[in-house]
């Protein structure tokens, strides 16, 4: 299956590296993680270069769901049970900071950033949803129950997080790449 994102944007192409060069930091890999690392280093004034063997965002990034959210599956109940509420809260807070940082990074970029609600559902177990919602309430997260989703099948319930986001990851990557030494 072809990437929806790759079909709707043309990423910049770069000539193969010829000869030696000097840099303080070399970032290897031109996926979203590599681009963001190189961007943050460059913004901090670090002499940085990024190298990619194939093409920018040719791996996982081109097939992403493109959602930017603090909810990645039914994870918080499990985190509390396995690691405790303090560590689960740290995970939640780190994801919230990442969401906020993406919003800042997207300002002024043509990347189709939209505020969206995020849902994680269970087709069969309302109990799983209730446990997740109880865990999120314990952590102070603003999630709520939903069961009327625009899906072609019934669900037992869903965790709904408001004010999450979605964007065009390759438009974002192209904008970031344009200001880097690649």
Locate predicted features.
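Extreme N-terminal leader/targeting segments of oxidoreductases
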Residues: 1-25, 43
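N-terminal Rossmann-like FAD-binding beta1-loop-alpha1 element of flavoenzymes
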Residues: 21-50
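Helical element adjacent to the flavin cofactor pocket in flavoenzyme catalytic cores
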Residues: 133-137, 158-182
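Conserved catalytic-core motifs of eukaryotic protein kinase domains, centered on the activation segment
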Residues: 60-62
């Amino acid at each position: 299956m072809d990437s929806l994102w790759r079909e709707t944007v043309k990423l910049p192409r770069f000539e193969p590296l010829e000869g030696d060069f000097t840099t303080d930091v070399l970032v290897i890999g031109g996926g979203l993680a590599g681009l963001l690392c190189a961007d943050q280093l460059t913004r901090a004034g670090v002499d940085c270069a990024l190298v990619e063997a194939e093409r920018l965002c040719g791996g996982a990034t081109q097939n992403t769901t493109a959602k930017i959210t603090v909810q990645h599956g039914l994870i918080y109940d499990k985190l509390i049970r396995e690691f405790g509420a303090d560590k689960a809260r740290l995970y939640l807070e780190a994801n919230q900071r990442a969401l906020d940082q993406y919003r800042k990074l997207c300002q002024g970029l043509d990347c189709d950033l939209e505020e969206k609600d995020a849902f994680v559902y269970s087709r069969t177990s309302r109990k799983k949803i209730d446990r997740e919602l109880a865990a999120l309430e314990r952590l102070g997260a603003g999630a709520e129950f939903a069961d009327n989703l625009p899906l072609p099948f019934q669900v037992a319930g869903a965790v709904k997080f408001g004010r999450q986001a979605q964007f065009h990851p390759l438009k974002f990557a192209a904008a970031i790449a344009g200001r880097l030494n690649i």
